[in-house]
């Protein structure tokens, strides 16, 4: 099983009726000061171009993995650990976005 602050990627297996344009999912572990990690499930229309459809915050990794399996049919064996370059690319995108809007 991945480490508690995992950064995981998987392609969607099942097209969602509610979000048919989503093709890939990233679960991005974020450290919280004086608390455990949280997990941002990021839905991508185009992962290579970082075209994000939306996201959802989970307090636990298991909860995020279960949601991805339920919504998109992603199995535990479908996930891969992201490379450091991928992590930095996503981290920069999160850090540079206007989260207060």
What are these model-predicted stretches?
Residues 47-101:
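Mixed-charge, Lys/Arg-enriched low-complexity segments
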Residues 1-21:
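Negatively charged, low-complexity tracts enriched in Asp/Glu with abundant Ser/Thr
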Residues 22-52:
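Short aromatic-glycine-(Arg/Gly/Cys) micro-motifs in beta-strand/loop hairpins
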């Amino acid at each position: 099983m991945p480490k508690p602050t995992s950064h995981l990627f998987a392609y969607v297996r099942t097209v969602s009726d509610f979000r048919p344009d989503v093709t890939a999912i990233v679960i991005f572990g974020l450290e919280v000061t004086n608390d455990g990690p949280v997990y941002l499930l990021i839905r991508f229309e185009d992962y290579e171009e970082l075209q994000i459809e939306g996201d959802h915050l989970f307090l636990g990794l298991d909860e995020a993995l279960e949601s991805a399996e339920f919504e998109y049919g992603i199995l535990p064996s479908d996930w891969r650990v992201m490379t450091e370059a991928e992590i930095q690319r996503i981290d920069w995108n999160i850090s540079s976005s206007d989260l207060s809007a």
